[in-house]
């Protein structure tokens, strides 16, 4: 096998850290391919690279620096250093791989010159964000393995197509693998993926993108094709980002700005992971932990931006992630999103926020320890959204459990424990069914209502269980209709247990027990309503004194029918209909 490996030292490539090695390296690689070598070995040493050499006049990073031919493996000793010579160009490439196939680059260190760079004025290119460590354009079957890349004025690695998708000469990059690399301190992004099919980034350390004099967007990994309106000129599809460690990247760890079919799995991250305007993104099994000493600016663990122009849905799945220490755990935006089996803790603002979204299912998540000295934390929140389902979630130790402002909602089979205010519907229409609500002597702030419906919101409050409350378990002040059906309220200690004001309401088949230590409690109090129905309820007064089981004297035309009342009375209005009630 040795005869198929060309040692760059034998070819006379300088590695003294004083002599420009670029032209000699290019000659070495070209000779290796022409003579049938499959591998070129670079031994220990410092190789100075003119990353501007040969660059295209319009795209200075193209055909610049070390030009890697196809069907070749470049192997570098761990102490082989490829060091870019300081320059003033707005764009360059240490290694350029263009329209080639079957290439491996492994080992060694590729070091840029961001700290020595001269940031000369360059018009629209004045950001100098196109200085790359490895630039891959329109290639197939490329592997970057165990390479340390740092300190570039643009990106450590960029994977792009050659040409535009609207032209016949468009050539995407496909079957690209970046693994076991360390990519650090790029001014723009550590890795950019702009146009591709089948790219994998795995088991890498991706650190400190955009720090210092960084330039936007400052992402660990940016998956972002160029497009205008609903036309894609570059298309990143089928990308897997898995089992990487992200540390200290300024704006986000991974952002799928507009890619298709993106998997982000099993990563460790201290900053945001975003599905952006992407389509068919799966974010699963990641550990997101915000350090306690991190910057105080609000941060979101997992987020999105919305539906891409020209597309109908986001089709995103956010599943099985562990998120702790962020201001907001998950911020959902777009259409057709599933958020399931995530665990979110130690947040200040919101566990899961659904904002300007539709067709979103939030199912089976555990949200806990939402405590803040400056704001009321919220476990689940929906704002300006429609067709949203909050199902089977467990919310523990939050100030406000569920807060809804607008749209149609289903809130079903959730467990809320240790909260101040449980479920609050401020706008829209909600079905609140099968939930268990237990404030359980919450002490962080004074206890408020377990379920409340206000303003002009409407709700069906059905088959819920209320335990250990010290304030209204059900409070409605809405002008719209509510139906309160089949709920179970245990041992109320309150002077008034259910308070309903204004609107027209149905209060059917609820089971309520009351045990107040002083005074005469009122169990159902209907105030300022006209034409409501109270029927089939079982009210069991365990208090020493007699209770007013149903009070409607400040409402009109109420129908009080078929209720079972133990140790209580009815205080009605003269216009009410009373029939078939059993009072014991």
Swiss-Prot record:
Keywords: Repeat
Native organism: Bacillus subtilis (strain 168)
Record keyword NAD present: no
SUPFAM superfamilies in alphabetical order: Pectin lyase-like (SSF51126)
PbH1 repeat boundaries on the chain: 100-128, 139-161, 173-195, 196-225, 236-266, 313-333, 334-356, 357-382, 406-427, 456-478, 529-554
Top-level taxon in the UniProt lineage: Bacteria
Name of the protein in question: Uncharacterized protein YclG
């Amino acid at each position: 096998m040795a005869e198929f490996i060309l040692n760059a030292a034998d070819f006379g490539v300088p590695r003294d850290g004083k002599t420009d090695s670029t032209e000699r390296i290019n000659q070495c690689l070209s000779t290796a391919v022409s003579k049938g070598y499959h591998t070129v070995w670079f031994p220990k040493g410092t190789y100075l690279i003119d990353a501007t050499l040969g660059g295209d006049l319009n795209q200075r990073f193209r055909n610049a620096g070390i030009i890697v031919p196809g069907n070749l493996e470049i192997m570098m000793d761990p102490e082989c250093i490829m060091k870019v010579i300081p320059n003033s160009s707005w764009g360059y490439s240490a290694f350029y791989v263009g329209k080639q196939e079957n290439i491996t680059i492994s080992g060694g260190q590729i070091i840029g010159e961001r700290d020595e760079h001269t940031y000369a004025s360059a018009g629209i290119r004045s950001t100098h964000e196109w200085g790359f460590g490895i630039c891959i354009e329109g290639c197939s079957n490329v592997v970057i393995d165990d390479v340390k890349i740092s300190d570039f004025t643009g990106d450590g690695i960029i994977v792009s197509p050659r040409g535009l998708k609207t032209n016949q000469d468009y050539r995407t990059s496909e079957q690209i693998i970046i693994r076991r690399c360390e990519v650090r301190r790029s001014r723009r992004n550590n890795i950019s993926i702009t146009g591709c099919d089948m790219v994998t980034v795995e088991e890498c350390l991706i650190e400190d993108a955009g720090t210092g004099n960084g330039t936007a967007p400052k992402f660990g990994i940016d998956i972002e094709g160029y497009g205008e309106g609903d036309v894609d000129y570059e298309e990143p599809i089928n990308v897997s980002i898995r089992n990487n460690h992200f540390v200290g990247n300024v704006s986000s760890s991974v952002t799928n700005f507009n890619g298709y079919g993106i998997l982000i799995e099993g990563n460790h991250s201290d900053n945001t992971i975003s599905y952006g305007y992407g389509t068919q993104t799966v974010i699963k099994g990641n550990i997101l932990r915000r350090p306690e000493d991190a910057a105080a600016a609000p941060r979101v663990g997992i987020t999105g931006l919305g539906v891409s122009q020209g597309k109908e849905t986001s089709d995103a799945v956010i599943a099985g992630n562990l998120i702790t220490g962020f201001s907001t755990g998950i911020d959902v935006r777009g259409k057709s999103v599933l958020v399931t089996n995530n665990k979110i803790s130690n947040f200040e603002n919101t566990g899961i926020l659904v904002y300007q979204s539709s067709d979103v299912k939030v199912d089976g998540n555990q949200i806990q320890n939402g405590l803040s000295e400056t704001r009321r934390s919220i476990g689940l929140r929906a704002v300006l959204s429609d067709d949203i389902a909050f199902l089977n979630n467990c919310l523990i130790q939050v100030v406000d459990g569920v807060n809804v402002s607008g749209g149609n909602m289903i809130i079903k089979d959730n467990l809320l424990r240790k909260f101040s205010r449980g479920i609050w519907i401020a706008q829209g229409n909600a079905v609140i069914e099968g939930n268990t609500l237990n404030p359980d002597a919450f002490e962080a702030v004074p206890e408020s209502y377990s379920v409340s419906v206000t303003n002009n919101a409407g709700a069906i409050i059905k088959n819920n269980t209320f335990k250990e409350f010290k304030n209204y378990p059900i409070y409605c002040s809405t002008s719209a209709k509510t139906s309160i059906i089949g709920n179970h309220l245990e041992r109320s200690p309150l002077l008034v247990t259910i308070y309903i004001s204004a609107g027209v309401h149905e209060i059917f088949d609820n089971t309520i027990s009351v045990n107040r230590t002083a005074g005469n409690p009122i169990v159902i109090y209907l105030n300022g309503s006209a034409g409501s129905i109270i029927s089939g309820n079982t009210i069991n007064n365990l208090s020493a004194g007699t209770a007013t089981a149903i009070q409607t004297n400040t409402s009109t035309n109420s129908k009080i029918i078929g209720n079972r009342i133990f140790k209580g009375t009815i205080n009605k209005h003269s216009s009410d209909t009373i029939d078939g009630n059993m009072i014991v």
